[in-house]
Each structure stands twice: as structure tokens, then as C-alpha cells.
């Protein structure tokens, strides 16, 4: 093995393939853009975003780690969300959960 050497897998790698998924329509009713990162608890996003927050509880965007989705003022778009894995505990963000989902 050479330091930094990569051993890529054959075929396609599917992100979040075994996780529960939902699609929501989200509208930015605010006057400023809102950007949401890949692992942010979607139910706790900026209040200017209008969508079914209860359906989004325990979910995050189904996008690659380290990326984000930007909602421009007045924009409406569909997003796909996936459930959190692991211990399914949420801390921080807007402090609405602070524990088990």
C-alpha cells in the first residue's frame, strides 16, 4: 500500500440507500436566501421556510455530506429527506429536540 492510495469500489455507490425517505415541497416566504446544510435537522430550519415540519422530524437532506441547498426568497422547490441513523439523537440546531427522536 502506498500512502494516500485509493482502492475504489466497482459499480455505483448509492447514498442513503436503506434509509426512510420522504419528499416535501418547501417555500421560502422570507426576504433573504436560506441555505441548509446536508446534515442539518430539517425540521429545525429557518422559520421563513414553509413546509410540513412534523413530517421532517428526524430527517435531513438527501444530498452528499458537506453540500447544501439554497432557497431564494419566494422560491418553492421539492427536496428529498432521509432519516437520521445511529442512535437517532438530535442536539443543538435550534434546541427543539435535545435528545432522542
Swiss-Prot record:
SUPFAM superfamilies, per database record: Urease, beta-subunit
GO cellular component term, pick one: urease complex
Principal cellular location given in the protein's record: cytoplasm
GO biological process, one term: urea catabolic process
UniProt KW Mitochondrion keyword: no
Catalytic activity: urea + 2 H2O + H(+) = hydrogencarbonate + 2 NH4(+)
Keyword Cytoplasm: yes
Location(s) in or outside the cell: Cytoplasm
Pfam families: Urease_beta
UniProt pathway annotation: Nitrogen metabolism; urea degradation; CO(2) and NH(3) from urea (urease route): step 1/1
Top enzyme class: hydrolase
Disulfide bonding pattern of the chain: none
Domain of life: Bacteria
Coiled-coil boundaries: none
GO terms assigned for molecular function: urease activity
Keywords recorded for this protein, A-Z: Cytoplasm, Hydrolase
Family, per entry: Belongs to the urease beta subunit family.
Assembly: Heterotrimer of UreA (gamma), UreB (beta) and UreC (alpha) subunits. Three heterotrimers associate to form the active enzyme.
Protein's UniProt name: Urease subunit beta
Gene label: ureB
